[in-house]
Structures are given as structure tokens and as C-alpha cells.
């Protein structure tokens, strides 16, 4: 995923379906991992790759783009992502009740 070469856009405009964009994934600790993905690739692959590199289960993380949660079946094209866009990652928090 991250080793593929980018094809230059012939028209200099919008990305075509087969083209790649670079995405920056930023964790809660401000660590950055860069991914190069196709516009039509389901973001499930990026999520799985990120969680594998971090050594945590993918279901323990929440991925957000522009404040909206990213589901597995979405693609960068569907989300209107562009080169160098940022995906934020947060640890899933469960439980937590107040004791009064």
C-alpha cells in the first residue's frame, strides 16, 4: 500500500479512480504515519494496516476524517479526500460511569 508509485495527473485536476493520494494518520500521541492509497480502496485496509503497525486491535481504535467517523466500506473518493489530508485516530473508550 505505501510502496506504490504515484501516477502524475495528466489534466492537473481531479484525481482519477486509479490514482493514489497520500494520507496522514495522526494518533492521540501526535505520532504520524503516512499512507499512499488508491481513491477507490476501502479504508478498512488503511485502518487494519495502521492498527497492525501500532500493535493494537483495529476495533479498539476510532478513525475520524473532518470530525466524522470513518466506516470500513468508505473510500477516499466517497469522502472527498485530497492529497495530504489528515485522519485522526483515537483509542476507543468504553464504560466509565460516575459514582455519586
Curated annotation (Swiss-Prot):
Q: Which residues form the propeptide?
A: 97-100
Q: Which domain of life is it from?
A: Eukaryota
After translation, the protein is modified as follows:
Cleavage of precursor form by a sentrin-specific protease is necessary for function.
Record carries keyword Cytoplasm = yes
SUPFAM superfamilies under this entry? Ubiquitin-like
Name the Gene Ontology biological process terms.
Answer: cellular response to cadmium ion; cellular response to heat; chordate embryonic development; definitive hemopoiesis; protein sumoylation
Transmembrane parts of this sequence: none
Cellular compartments annotated: Nucleus membrane; Nucleus speckle; Cytoplasm; Nucleus, PML body
Any single Gene Ontology cellular-component annotation: nuclear stress granule
Indicate the secretion signal residues: none
Every copy of the Ubiquitin-like domain together lies at 19-96
Q: Does the keyword Membrane apply?
A: yes
Between which residues do disulfide bridges form? none
Alphabetical UniProt keywords: Cell membrane, Cytoplasm, Isopeptide bond, Membrane, Nucleus, Ubl conjugation pathway
Query: What Gene3D superfamilies does its record include?
Result: Phosphatidylinositol 3-kinase Catalytic Subunit, Chain A, domain 1
**Record's InterPro entries?**
Rad60/SUMO-like_dom, SUMO1_Ubl, Ubiquitin-like_dom, Ubiquitin-like_domsf
Cross-link Glycyl lysine isopeptide (Gly-Lys) (interchain with K-? in acceptor proteins), residue numbers? Answer: 96
**Alphabetical list of SMART domains matching this protein:** UBQ
Q: Name one GO molecular function term.
A: protein tag activity
Assembly behavior: Interacts with sae2, ube2i, ranbp2, pias1 and pias2. Covalently attached to a number of proteins.
The text of the family note is: Belongs to the ubiquitin family. SUMO subfamily.
Instruction: Please give the function described in this protein's UniProt entry.
Output: Ubiquitin-like protein that can be covalently attached to proteins as a monomer or a lysine-linked polymer. Covalent attachment via an isopeptide bond to its substrates requires prior activation by the E1 complex sae1-sae2 and linkage to the E2 enzyme ube2i. This post-translational modification on lysine residues of proteins plays a crucial role in a number of cellular processes such as nuclear transport, DNA replication and repair, mitosis and signal transduction.
Q: What is this protein called?
A: Small ubiquitin-related modifier 1
Which organism is this protein's natural source?
Danio rerio
What's the name of its gene? sumo1
